[in-house]
């Protein structure tokens, strides 16, 4: 099952990261503005948020097996749509379709991991997160290489349908051997929407992932603009996601206590160093800034999921909180690339964007101090 989880995780980001290295060509071919081009990343991320908010309904009405299978099919179809000549409506439709598939899977998987790997939740959550980040790195690194070996540059984006199909068959075979899905499990109902902590977690998760979403949308374009090649710029994004994968594996493994604040603070400091490097010394040590920023972003992602799961020992309740956190968070994160595009149009460069995210990280450090685990059991409002 772990191998299948990794295969599925590898398909969660290439639809987003494969676009970045080709964004200048896509803009030129389709006539998109910076703000519209940003929607290629923003739209699927916002869609992830909407589907995460619907996670509770999906959990009750659609079997785990079918929801993941349908989602992988949607990701494959979304990638295949990019086989055609790039037009704004077509590209945005493919982003929306893929975002639906990604959103459903991300709403389902945390509670699946907590239920099936209860004694190893931090390690498996780290592995799942590392697979997400690793898939993003593959999308950024392999796409420019495929362009060099393809007669039609834009059709290389459609190749990312293949791993989704492989994961679909692997999941369908493996899930047939598993016991009945958890959507039939009953627990004490809890209204997470009415708790201030749930909203705090949502904003926290959103601001962290907003930095990631802006980087995968604009980091290659930023370096192309200041003189780097498309191949080199895509490689920097791949190195950032390699750092993310390392952070996603290492930091949850270091989380031996329920208090996640020290590790979260470390992850945020690394992000701040990376964004400051992009602002002041972008061409001097680009590999270092990309790796350090990725390490912080990758470590923060699974730690946020663990932080939410820590709030209840019941997988269904914890899963409901994670779904709400991801829902609000991904909607916020999805606005970040669009806002970055607006800042780019206003200022003429990307420095305002990196400065904005650096300020967000400082705010996140202050919020982190509030996550004392001793208060977790007191934070819920039960339904009558």
Swiss-Prot record:
Taxonomy, superkingdom: Bacteria
This protein's UniProt keywords: Cell inner membrane, Cell membrane, Membrane, Transmembrane, Transmembrane helix, Transport
Parts forming coiled coils: none
InterPro entries assigned to the protein according to its UniProt record, in alphabetical order: CynX-like, MFS, MFS_Cyanate_Porter, MFS_dom, MFS_trans_sf
BP term (GO), one: cyanate catabolic process
Gene: cynX
UniProt family annotation: Belongs to the major facilitator superfamily. Cyanate porter (TC 2.A.1.17) family.
PANTHER family: CYANATE TRANSPORT PROTEIN CYNX (PTHR23523:SF1), PTHR23523
Protein name: Cyanate transport protein CynX
Annotated transmembrane regions: 3-23, 34-54, 68-88, 89-109, 122-142, 153-173, 204-224, 235-255, 263-283, 287-307, 322-342, 354-374
Subcellular location field: Cell inner membrane
Organism: Escherichia coli (strain K12)
Gene Ontology terms, MF aspect: transmembrane transporter activity
